[in-house]
Amino acid sequence: SIHGNETSGADAALGIIYHLIASQDKDVLDMLKEMVIIIDPVMNPDGRARFAKNLEQYRGTAPNYDDQSLIHTGDWPYGRTNHYYFDLNRDWVYLTQPETQGRVSLINEWKPQILVDAHEMGSQDTFMTGPAREPINKNVDYDLIKWGNVFAKDQGQEFDKRNWRFYTGEWHEDLYPGYSFYVAFKGTLGILYEQSRMAEDGVRRPEGTIQSYKESVHHQYVSTIVNLKTLKENSKAMYEDYWDGRKFNVSSDSKYANRSYVILPTKNNGRLNVLANKLKAQEIEIYKNNKQISVSN
């Protein structure tokens, strides 16, 4: 979980860790033989600690199912942000925060095939996942969109089997690279979960039923297991598409062929160095030119 007050994803991650370690199911054992699974339950520990303190302060002796109450709305400073009150899910491309820098460094090292980003949304909502709707960034390989549909179909079928409410797309678009969608530019399929937020006590829904926090965690947990199974079945084909796409992007037929971007020197060396360091952190190659050149648009 990247937002500290959206806790069901982090708690589901703990269940996933236990399941992968303890299970003797053949499917799980085969998965562990063939895959490297990296689980980072809490990207924002400071925000989660702040949210946990709010729960401790505002919780009563009996569960409060009214989502208008303080335990559900919280107060400032909210747990969404990190210690510096920065929303980490806007920072993937800019790398201004230490948490983001560490996460991006890990992604660059392992180059995962998929990345799951578990969130929460309004308490009267249900569950949303991909595929995203338009606008979709035109610099993303079509193969990632294709595979996103495959993963979404498997996940949706599992939800249907369990009679769980969910929807896809709607307000979820893949355009701005400051979100976790940023990984698509590295050839990784980003998968978003948005679970209605229960704030641990649960919430009374319009039809009168109570949705528990346990259910929220279970939705995130099952989604992850399904996504891992889909990856296991399609990993080789995804690698082939990744290889073909990367090879084409550096070929003479690519729209990116024969292009260079020149950063002109200025008197502000500090800003120039900051830009250069951010580009290098994103594994963008930089060369220093010492010769006279001419350029045209």
Language-model features, listed with the residues they occupy:
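Aromatic- and acidic-residue-enriched segments that line the glycan-binding/catalytic groove
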Residues: 49-67
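Alpha-helical scaffolding within the catalytic cores
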Residues: 55, 66, 70-74, 102, ...
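Short, conserved secondary-structure transition motifs
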Residues: 32-51
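Active-site-adjacent "subsite" loops/lids of carbohydrate-active enzymes
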Residues: 74-89
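Active-site metal-binding loops of divalent metal-dependent hydrolases
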Residues: 2, 43, 120
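Short acidic/polar alpha-helix capping motifs at helix-coil junctions
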Residues: 65-70, 142-146
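Intrinsic-disorder/low-complexity accessory segments
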Residues: 2-7, 11, 15-35, 84, ...
